Design a protein with these regions (language model features):
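Extracellular S/T/G-rich loop segment that most often corresponds to the catalytic His/Ser-adjacent loop
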Residues: 1-72, 76, 80
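Acidic glycine-/aspartate-rich tracts in secreted/extracellular proteins
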Residues: 4-7, 42, 95-97, 314-317, ...
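A structural signal for beta-strand register positions
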Residues: 4, 289, 308, 350-352, ...
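Surface-exposed loop/turn motifs in large extracellular/passenger domains
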Residues: 273-287, 299-303, 330, 343, ...
Length: 431
């Protein structure tokens, strides 16, 4: 994961950058967009060992602790995650809602002194626009430019550049105008530590490997790319909405792209070729529980190999939905909650659906021979409920139990199957 230091403010969820929002020394994210996050790195109050006080510093050395600290918080929330998954959380929760000037100014001293102007419009900026951007950036923080004079840079660099022919401008060592996208400048966005502790916000095929690809007979042996979360006995909550990103050639060198020019090389040399047409899904494995509380729109199935998966809304009532993904509960897995799976639930394990006030809602329900559909009645007669919108096919076991409590000898409760399982068509499609 690379870093891009900047100076920015946040208001109403939007990141705003002024003329000096992008640090002059930034190399931007171009060519490394997929694994770059931007973080505050300009004019940071840092500890000074010489004076035992504080000093103002700028640079990636100031941005790095911001990201490292956020990663530590994520690791504290999800101690079972591996390093790749911690990076995924940081990258997918970064704030890409960024407002900035049309032209950003940088200063490149890697080879020879050069002014770099990054612009977002389709047309190359005029001399007047470049001078205005340079002037605003310089006047905002003259000290950052050291010995360099604004007037001398305008006269000897900018004006000289625009007096040259187009071919000469391309070879100019002192002024470069580079057209970019915001992603090429800021990468995946600006670090958002608060959102990061809520878990990943996207399943990204581009950050998976060929080992991520699996098939399941229940889904026609179609190959999908899965992110595997082994909770290792922990309780974890993914509070963010989880979307998806499919394979995108723009993140890869020509040799690894999937177009006509790259396909033969892909077949021979790249394991990533297997990912090119795959949709991302999620596998929950290991002891413990993982709760999905967002409005999740990723396409491929959600598999419960071990432990429990909870699908429930957030405390404010939002989320708790799988919009596109179906759920497969294997024999060592469990499913519970008060959420909604719009597509299909296939239960070969244990399913404890909903409550009496908030049923678990599914589009289609299928239960295999090893499946157990579990209902619990408390001493007041309240019980959980499953709501099926379309079709149901149930094998295996339907279990009815009592909540652990004190019951009088006179306690009794009469229940109809329709009290436990609600079918939208009144039971016509029940098998």
């Amino acid at each position: 994961m690379s870093l891009n230091p900047l100076d920015a403010t946040r208001k109403d969820g939007k990141i705003s950058l002024g003329p000096t929002g992008l640090s002059l020394f930034s190399n931007i994210a171009r060519g490394a967009e997929l694994f770059t996050v931007s973080a505050p790195g300009g004019y940071i109050s840092a500890a000074d060992a010489v004076t035992n006080g504080y000093t103002i510093k700028s640079g990636t050395s100031m941005a790095t602790p911001q990201v490292s600290g956020a990663a530590a918080l994520v690791a504290q929330a999800f101690p079972w995650m591996n390093g790749k998954q911690l990076a995924d959380v940081i990258l997918t929760t970064a704030n890409s809602n960024i407002e900035c000037p049309d032209i950003l100014v940088g200063f490149d001293e890697s080879t020879e002194t050069a002014l770099v102007f990054y612009y977002f419009s389709t047309e190359k900026p005029s001399e007047e626009q470049v001078i205005k951007a340079l002037t605003e950036t310089y006047n905002k923080d003259p000290e950052a430019w050291g010995y360099r004079s604004l007037n001398s840079m305008i006269e000897y660099f900018v004006k000289d550049h625009f007096e040259k022919s187009e071919a000469e401008q391309e070879q100019d060592k002192y002024v470069r105008l580079i057209r970019v996208t915001k992603e090429e400048v800021f990468g995946q966005g600006v670090l958002d530590a608060g959102k990061a502790v809520g878990g990943p916000a996207r399943l990204d095929v581009n950050r998976m490997s060929s080992n991520s690809v699996k098939t399941y007979a229940e889904f026609g042996n179609t190959a999908y790319a899965f992110e595997v979360f082994d909770t290792q006995g922990h309780m974890a909550v993914f509070n963010n909405d989880i979307s998806e990103r499919l394979w995108d050639d723009k993140y890869y060198h020509e040799e690894y792209r999937t177009g006509l020019q790259g396909i033969s090389r892909l077949t021979r040399s790249s394991e990533n070729s297997i990912l090119a047409d795959k949709k991302p899904g999620l596998i929950k494995t290991g002891w413990g529980m993982l709760a999905l509380m967002g409005t999740n729109t990723y396409s491929a199935p959600t598999i419960v190999e071990g432990g429990s998966l909870m699908i429930s809304p957030r405390p404010d009532g939002s989320g708790g939905i799988l919009v596109n993904s179906s759920v497969l509960v294997q024999k060592d897995g469990g499913l519970l909650g008060t959420g909604t799976v719009i597509n299909r639930v296939i239960n070969n394990g244990v399913f404890l659906p909903g409550t009496d006030e908030a049923p678990f809602t599914v589009g289609d329900y299928e239960q295999g021979p090893t499946g157990d559909l579990l209902f619990i009645v408390d001493r007041y007669g309240a019980h959980n409920q499953l709501k099926i919108l379309n079709t149901a096919k149930v094998e295996g076991t339907l279990s009815l139990g009592l909540e652990k409590a004190f019951y009088t000898n006179e306690f009794s409760q009469r229940l109809q199957l329709t009290d436990l399982i609600s079918l939208a068509d009144g039971g016509k499609n029940r098998n």
